[in-house]
Amino acid sequence: RIGETLFFGNNLFTGEDIEEMEQDIFRLNAEIIELTEKPVVPIGEIGENVAGEVKEFDEGNYGKTSYRAILDIGLLDIDPQNIEPLDDQIEITGASSDMIVVDLGPHKPQYRVGDLLPFKINYMGALTILSSQYIAKKVV
């Protein structure tokens, strides 16, 4: 796992960052392919997602809405647990094989369809993305 130290500046013995090294040299940019205002709590029966999980919702949010974006990247590309939105107002709320859904919050977002959302990516995420033939890579 020397790559984790070299590319992410992680001290594998202590779990801490190495101060003299950069921790964020990789970025994942995912394109917004759909943007919609939706209820925070879905109406109707809630079934299992592709991973067999049933999402739970706070009934106190019934009647509230937020903006959701669908991104052009999914579970076949990366596990959402390996990425973190750079915008701390954005929350990853779900994923399917070919898309990730993010919640942009209750206020009309500055984002539009076609915009790229940047994400921090961890070591396992970088391994997955760099190995994928379906993800364009760009060295800056």
What are these regions (language model features)?
Residues 1-140:
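Active-site anion/phosphate-binding pocket segments in diverse small-molecule metabolic enzymes
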